[in-house]
From Swiss-Prot:
Site (described: Mediates proton transfer from the outer aqueous phase to the interior of the protein): E148
Subcellular location field: Cell inner membrane
Protein name: H(+)/Cl(-) exchange transporter ClcA
CDD domains: EriC (cd01031)
Annotated site residue numbers, Mediates proton transfer from the protein to the inner aqueous phase: E203
């Protein structure tokens, strides 16, 4: 009697068939869904990292304030503690960068732009811990820096980390996940998903390879990072300035004048940043000890200012609603503006791990408020609010400096929830961008990247000459 024939398909063959079906699904319609899945993973990790970074900075700042409270009865001791706390935190950040990952210094956005062009390395195993903990030190110490620089660079490096862990190959996957991580980092830093998308498309337009896959991945990454941010921080505008009145049509010409002012100041500000970089480099000369001590002095100065004049230190998010509400006199606004220009130049140009978006938003707000106070006095018949010019000015300096008007406009709208001011903001941003371009100003990040690449080329040339000289001896 014949026994039943067993199934010819072994368990191993069944597993292989299932894997093949899954692979066909992932590659259906020539759409590598694996990249989109990785984009979701990247966005989730970036959102969590941004939340952890934000909470860490806030915790360090609170600890620093508590230390000052305990010495409030002794004024000389209070000033000493204010200086030392910030100096030590800053020195910690400078030391990590200089010792372990020099590319983690500064904003980090030019590094991502260079990586997208295959001109800069992405050493995520070094950059991630150095940028995270170094940024905690400098921002937690009250330096005039923004959180977006660290989160964008951390995001791009997380994209590369995920690529390496899952062993995805190909330039498209590498480029897409780098861009996705960077966009997710900006979105999570400001709770501004649309600004994160526009940042990649506009600011990184020379480097971003716009394809259907890459833009889908950026969308997915930004969505996931924003969800992570809002889970821990609720769905509220990052900066609460209240609902401001709309700008009447017969006052729009005033916003064009404001844009012209920023169009003049933006290129000048960029030159000051680059000039301060050269000056501070001459001070430390590349010596790690001098560089760390210099950073400690700058950090300590910011710590003192944070106690004596709080509006002149820190990223500036606490300053923006106060200035927009008109709580400063004209003289105080001028003082804050001058002081913050100096501290922004010192902190950012020194190579501290931190961004410049937030300080520029604060500078734009202060200058916009001052302009608004002037026009309110000059044109009482218009019944204007100085706060509307503050909001218009927030994104105008970004537009003039980094040449990204759309990103600046949408970023401010998402952060303040004042969408009714979109028309005056467009006029201000357009005026600032056109005049900055007309006067020959170049985007700040492009200038910094060009300097970095020139330095890299010089170092490679010096090493090759040294190697050839040693071979000849």
């Amino acid at each position: 009697m014949k026994t039943d024939t067993p199934s010819l398909e072994t368990p191993q063959a069944a597993r292989l068939r299932r894997r093949q079906l899954i692979r066909q699904l992932l590659e259906r319609d020539k759409t590598p869904l694996a990249i989109l899945f990785m984009a979701a993973v990247v966005g989730t990790l970036v959102g969590l990292a941004a939340v952890a970074f934000d909470k860490g900075v806030a915790w360090l700042q609170n600890q620093r304030m508590e230390a000052l409270v305990h010495t409030a009865d002794n004024y000389p001791l209070l000033l000493t503690v204010a200086f030392l706390c910030s100096a030590v935190l800053a020195m910690f950040g400078y030391f990590l960068v200089r010792k372990y990952a020099p590319e983690a210094g500064g904003s980090g956005i030019p590094e991502i732009e260079g990586a997208l062009e295959d001109q800069r390395p992405v050493r995520w195993w070094r950059v991630l811990p150095v940028k995270f903990f170094g940024g905690l030190g400098t921002l937690g110490g009250g330096m005039v820096l923004g959180r977006e620089g660290p989160t964008v660079q951390i995001g791009g490096n997380i994209g590369r980390m995920v690529l390496d862990i899952f062993r995805l190959k190909g330039d498209e996957a590498r480029h897409t996940l780098l861009a996705t991580g960077a966009a997710a980092g900006l979105a999570a830093a400001f709770n501004a998903p649309l600004a994160g998308i526009l940042f990649i498309i506009e600011e990184m337009r020379p480097q971003f390879r716009y394809t259907l896959i890459s833009i889908k991945a950026v969308f997915i990454g930004v969505i996931m990072s924003t969800i992570m941010y809002r889970i821990f921080n609720h769905e509220v505008a990052l900066i609460d300035v209240g609902k401001l009145s709309d700008a009447p049509l017969n006052t729009l010409w005033l916003y064009l004048i404001l844009g012209i002012i920023f169009g003049i100041f933006g290129p000048i500000f960029n030159k000051w940043v680059l000039g301060m970089q050269d000056l501070l480099h001459r001070v430390h000369g590349g010596n790690i000890t001098k560089w760390v001590l210099m950073g400690g002095a700058i950090g300590g100065l910011c710590g003192l200012l944070g106690f004596v004049a709080p509006a002149t230190s820190g990223g500036g998010f606490n300053l923006i609603p106060i200035a927009t509400a008109g709580n400063f006199s004209m003289g105080m606004l001028v003082f804050i503006f001058v002081a913050r220009v100096i501290t922004t130049l010192l902190c950012f140009s020194s190579g501290a791990p931190g961004g410049i978006f937030a300080p520029m938003l604060a500078l734009g707000t202060v200058l916009g408020t001052a302009f608004g106070m002037v026009v309110v006095e000059l044109f009482p018949q218009y019944h204007l609010e100085a706060g509307t010019f503050a909001i218009a000015g927030m994104g105008a300096l970004l537009a003039a400096s980094i040449r990204a008007p759309l990103t600046g406009i949408i970023l401010v709208l998402e952060m303040t929830d004042n969408y009714q001011l979109i028309l005056p903001m467009i006029i201000t941003g357009l005026g600032a961008t056109l005049l900055a371009q007309f006067t020959g100003g170049k985007p700040l990040y492009s200038e910094i990247l060009a300097r970095t690449l020139a330095k890299q080329e010089a170092e490679q040339l010096a090493r090759s000459k040294a190697a050839s000289a040693s071979e000849n001896t």
